[in-house]
């Protein structure tokens, strides 16, 4: 049994606690989206080798240790997490851990229709679906020729039927690529109870061809949407929430904006990321990870102690200093640590 560490909250060098864990369960993905895992840079069979992947036992021990040092929110990512064999079994084990207040999953939605019921029954509480276009040909193109929008929409419908009533729908907007999909997406999801969120194109990884000119800022997107459907700002749901929330003035739901490039939120970042092979990344824009497997072999107690030590020296604030920083190390790819 791990000791109660609530009396001594863990903080990094800037006084930021650790509350949110993004845990990748697999590196493989069935899509090849250009801003994450472009087909010309990543082979089709990438990430399918399970030799280095943490087992379910290891993942449960890891999550228990993170809970012991303050984590209350857990999100499963990939790659595409629904490719992980027997994922509902893992979710059932993680959902049973005392202290986990929110258990969510991010998916491209292509496999969601066949798994939605099992995910709900296992204890998954929330789902986020990535969707960068509604137009079928553009959606297929942006997924590297792998995705069909009808499959994703069917997955969302199946999730609703399974009991997931308030999904988040994430759209990464790139200038001259899918800008014209913004208003159609808003029109489609307004009034459904789901929350559409627009994410600025970020310089995560080194193979997505990022350049500042390709960024459509949240302010620009908000103005476009507001001109069609008036918006009013909402307060954050919790400290460290990444999306700026706005309600539709007519009461038909809300829309969110994630502004990592134009309005950095490093100051409130309470998130850590762990890759499928057990490496800790304390920032989405990190250039290298820290292997947790040796500490994991010591069990919950040993790993919890190790995590406290690692977090106490954390000083990441890349988005705040992006303009004045020249990278000398290759940043980790998004598909290794999720979004």
Curated annotation (Swiss-Prot):
Residues 13-249 form the Radical SAM core domain. [4Fe-4S] cluster 1 binds at residues 29, 33, 36. GO terms for biological process: Mo-molybdopterin cofactor biosynthetic process. Keywords: 4Fe-4S, GTP-binding, Iron, Iron-sulfur, Lyase, Metal-binding, Molybdenum cofactor biosynthesis, Nucleotide-binding, S-adenosyl-L-methionine. It is an enzyme of class 4 (lyase). GTP binds at residues 22, 75, 106, 168, 271-273. Its EC number is 4.1.99.22. Its cofactor is [4Fe-4S] cluster. Gene3D superfamilies: Aldolase class I. InterPro entries: Aldolase_TIM, Elp3/MiaA/NifB-like_rSAM, MoaA, MoaA_NifB_PqqE_Fe-S-bd_CS, MoaA_twitch, MoCo_biosynth_MoaA/MoaC, rSAM. Belongs to the radical SAM superfamily. MoaA family. HAMAP family: MoaA_B. Catalyzes the cyclization of GTP to (8S)-3',8-cyclo-7,8-dihydroguanosine 5'-triphosphate. This is GTP 3',8-cyclase. The lineage of its organism: Bacteria, Pseudomonadati, Pseudomonadota, Gammaproteobacteria, Lysobacterales. The gene is moaA.
């Amino acid at each position: 049994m791990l000791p109660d560490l609530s009396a001594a909250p863990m903080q990094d060098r800037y006084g930021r606690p650790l509350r949110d864990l993004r845990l990748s369960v697999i590196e493989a993905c069935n899509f090849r989206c250009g801003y994450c895992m472009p087909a010309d840079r990543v082979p089709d069979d990438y990430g399918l080798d399970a030799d280095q992947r943490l087992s379910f036992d290891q993942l449960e021990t890891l999550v228990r240790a993170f809970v012991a040092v303050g984590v209350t929110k857990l999100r499963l990512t990939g790659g595409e997490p629904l490719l992980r064999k027997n994922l509902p079994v893992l979710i059932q084990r993680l959902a049973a851990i005392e202290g986990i207040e929110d258990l969510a999953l991010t998916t491209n939605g292509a496999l969601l229709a066949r798994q939605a019921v099992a995910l709900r029954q296992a204890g998954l509480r929330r789902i986020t679906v990535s969707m960068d276009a509604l137009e079928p040909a553009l959606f297929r193109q942006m997924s590297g020729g792998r995705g069909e929008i009808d499959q994703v929409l069917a997955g969302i419908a199946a999730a609703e039927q399974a009991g997931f009533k308030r999904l988040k729908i994430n759209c990464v907007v790139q200038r001259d690529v899918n800008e014209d999909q913004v208003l159609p997406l808003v029109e489609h999801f307004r009034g459904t109870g789901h929350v559409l969120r627009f994410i600025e194109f970020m310089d995560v990884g080194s193979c997505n061809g990022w350049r500042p000119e390709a960024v459509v800022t949240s302010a620009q997107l908000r103005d476009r949407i507001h001109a069609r459907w008036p918006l009013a700002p909402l307060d954050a749901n919790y400290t460290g929430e990444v999306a700026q929330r706005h309600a539709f003035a007519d009461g038909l739901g809300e829309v969110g904006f994630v502004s990592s490039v134009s309005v950095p939120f490093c100051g409130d970042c309470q998130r850590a990321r762990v890759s499928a092979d057990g490496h800790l990344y304390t920032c989405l824009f990190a250039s290298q990870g820290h292997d947790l497997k040796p500490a994991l072999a010591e069990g919950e107690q040993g790993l919890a102690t190790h995590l406290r030590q690692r977090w106490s020296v954390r000083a990441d604030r890349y988005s705040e200093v992006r303009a004045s920083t020249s990278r000398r190390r290759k940043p980790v790819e998004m598909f290794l640590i999720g979004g």
